[in-house]
């Protein structure tokens, strides 16, 4: 089964990412909740890269590679856009966002809650986000 995909940085390609992750995960007997959480986390990172790092520039690309390491799945999403500076990130109060009806700004916080480990790296001009999830 193919375990990598490359898409142009257009929001219309987010469905392609979600479908690809769902198809890949279908080989494993995951609960529907876990499957949907993983798809949500990968979709959120891909959306952030498309919108914020690459300014929805369809001439730019991001790549997703999925691999299994023992009991853990690794989702590696890479691009050549503006790198995410985790040191500048302040986790929002999700309950407060809900209470006041604020939209947006909680994606990374949700990803942090869903995945076991989240890493942001830069190697040369390539930015990499690694999402780890133990499911086996």
Where are these regions (language model features)?
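Helix-loop-beta hinge of the Bergerat
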Residues: 2-32
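Short beta-strand/loop element within the Bergerat-fold HATPase_c
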Residues: 61-71
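Glycine-rich/acidic phosphate-handling loop/turn and adjacent ATP-lid/helix
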Residues: 75-103
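Glycine-rich phosphate-binding loop
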Residues: 100-115
């Amino acid at each position: 089964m193919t375990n990598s995909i490359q898409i142009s940085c257009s929001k219309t390609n987010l469905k392609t990412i979600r479908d690809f992750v769902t198809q890949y995960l279908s080989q494993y007997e995951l609960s529907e909740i876990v499957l949907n959480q993983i798809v949500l986390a990968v979709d959120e990172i891909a959306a952030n890269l498309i919108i914020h790092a690459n300014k929805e520039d369809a001439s730019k690309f991001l790549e997703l590679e999925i691999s299994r390491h023992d009991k853990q799945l690794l989702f590696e999403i890479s691009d050549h856009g503006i790198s995410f500076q985790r040191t500048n990130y302040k986790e929002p109060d999700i309950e407060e966002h809900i209470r006041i009806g604020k939209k947006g700004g909680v994606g990374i916080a949700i990803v942090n809650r869903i995945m076991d480990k989240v890493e942001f790296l830069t190697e040369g001009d390539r930015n990499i986000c690694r999402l780890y999830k133990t499911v086996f």
